[in-house]
Structure formats: structure tokens, C-alpha cells
Amino acid sequence: MPTQASQKRWKQILQSIYDAIEDHGYPPTVREIGKSVGLSSSSTVAAYLEKLLAAGLIAKDPAKPRTLEVTSAGRDFIGVQDHGIPIVGTVAAGVPITAIENIDDYFPVPDDLPYAADELFMLRVQGNSMIKIGILDGDQIIVKKQNDAENGQIVVAMTEEDEATVKRFYKEKNGIRLHPENDSMDDMFFPDVTILGIVVSLYRPALV
């Protein structure tokens, strides 16, 4: 366990990382963390980050830039409670519509999903472009946050027009093809898209 002084600094750094991800959707740089907590030396901040990694309070993918995140243990350390999976709005499954980024509600993490709540978000589907694989209008899809995908995976993607849509993803020689699972609809082609995540589960509200 850290000393009382170190514990205070650990909490400051964890809070800085957590707040940046909550506010901006991505973690801060080492320099930004230092500025936030009053440390001018980047090497000192880096040393603290190594200690937090070793303690399991933060995690990162060494093969990718800016993948720092606060773990469940880290959130417990700073007193942040998990509410569940955030429901962040509506995504198009047909003609794309602008995604709503504010959190509308929270949904409990299903027991059979091997992910933490902070790795996921939910979106409500509008349209019928994915009906062949059982994603229907009004369904709520559970999405694992990640910025890449393999060909054939079902993704939530943001197009160049800043509109979000759920489609089957294919990276091709001349760009990206988003394939609807509906025989009456055509494929969509883009030079590039931003992947928000891959669909890992689905919830269908019960009819009353």
C-alpha cells in the first residue's frame, strides 16, 4: 500500500484520468495529467503511472496510443460507483441519423457478458437494415467500446457526416464498406469511418 502522501497523489492522478475520459471520451496525456495535479516533471508522472499499473488501478494497451483507463479497482479507490451500462441515445439502422451522446439511463450488465460496465454502451436501434440477423427496430444493442474491427463484425460506426450507424463492417482496397443485413438496401461506401465499437449483445424490451 502507498504511504498516506502517495495515496493522496494516486487519487489525484486517478481522478484526473477518470475525469478526462468522462469529459472527452479519451484519456489525458502525461503532460496533461501533470498539469492537472501540479506535477511539472513528466518522468515523475510516468513513474506514478507505472505504480498505478502495477497496483491494477489503471490499465492500458501497450500496442496502442492513448488507451489508458481506470479499472474497477481504480474506481473503487477514488470512490466512483459503477451505475451500469450507459444508454447514450439512438443509432440508425437504415438511413443514418445523428447519434445522441448524452447518457439517457443505465442498464445492468448481463451476467453472461465478460465485460465491465465501463467497456460498454447501449444504443437504441431505429430502422430495419439489420433484420436478417435479428436486430429489429426498437432493439437496444450492447456495444463494446473499441476503435477497430475485423471484416464481418457488426459495428457502430461514425461516418464523415458525424452520423452513427450500425452495419456489418468490411475494409476494402478503396475504403470502407458498411453492409446492411436487409436485401432491399444497398451497401454504403466511405473513404473512412470512425468505429465506436462492436455489437456484443442485444436487449429487446418486453411488449406490454
Curated annotation (Swiss-Prot):
One of its GO terms (molecular function) is serine-type endopeptidase activity. GO terms for biological process: DNA repair; DNA replication; negative regulation of DNA-templated transcription; proteolysis; SOS response. Homodimer. This is LexA repressor. CDD domains: S24_LexA-like (cd06529). The lineage of its organism: Bacteria, Bacillati, Bacillota, Bacilli, Lactobacillales. Represses a number of genes involved in the response to DNA damage (SOS response), including recA and lexA. In the presence of single-stranded DNA, RecA interacts with LexA causing an autocatalytic cleavage which disrupts the DNA-binding part of LexA, leading to derepression of the SOS regulon and eventually DNA repair. The gene is lexA. It catalyses: Hydrolysis of Ala-|-Gly bond in repressor LexA.
